[in-house]
C-alpha cells in the first residue's frame, strides 16, 4: 500500500537553466515478476530471494542519461542562454530565460522549439503597454495651461506578427542582442513623451502660433487658420 511508483527523469527550468531532474526508482513491485521469482525459488528449494537482483521493482522508462533528454536539454539551454533587449528609446523590455521558459515546447520531431503562439501573446502585452496611436496626451501650452490633446492619427502601433518573428529569430540566432519592434504606424518620437521639445503650437481660439525648438521659443506670431466667408472654418 505504501509503495512509491518510479518517476521518469525530466527537464525543468531552474536558476541554472534547463536541467535534467534525475529519475526516481521507487519501491513499486511488479506483481507478476514477484510471483514468478517466488515460484522459481520454491522450485529450487531456496529459502530467500533478492527481489532487487531479480528485477522485481518497476523501473522508470526514462533515465537521466537518455540521449533524447540530453539533446533536448542542450537545445533548451541554447535558447535560454540568449537575452533579447527590446528597445523603446527611454524604456526597454528584456526577454530572458524568465520570460522565455514558458515558450519552450517539444515539436513534432521531438526537438525543443519556441512557441510562436506564446511569444505572440507576450507581444500582445507589449502592445497594451506601448501602442499609443490615437491616445490623448497631456500638454502644457505656451501660456502655462495644462491641457489634454486628443490623439488624432498620431502615435505608434506595434506589428504583432512581424515583431513576434523578429524576437524568435533573434533568440534562435544564439546571440544576445538589442532589437526594435516592427511597427504598423510610427510617430516622431518613441520616448514616453512623444511630443518632445520641438513642435508647433497653434491656438484656434487666440489665432496664434508658437514654434519651439529644443525647448526654446523661436517664433510667436498671429495667424489666420480659416476663412468663414468661404466656408473654411477651423475647429
What are these regions (language model features)?
Residues 1-235:
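Surface-exposed, secretory/extracytoplasmic low-complexity segments enriched in Ser/Thr/Asn/Gly/Pro
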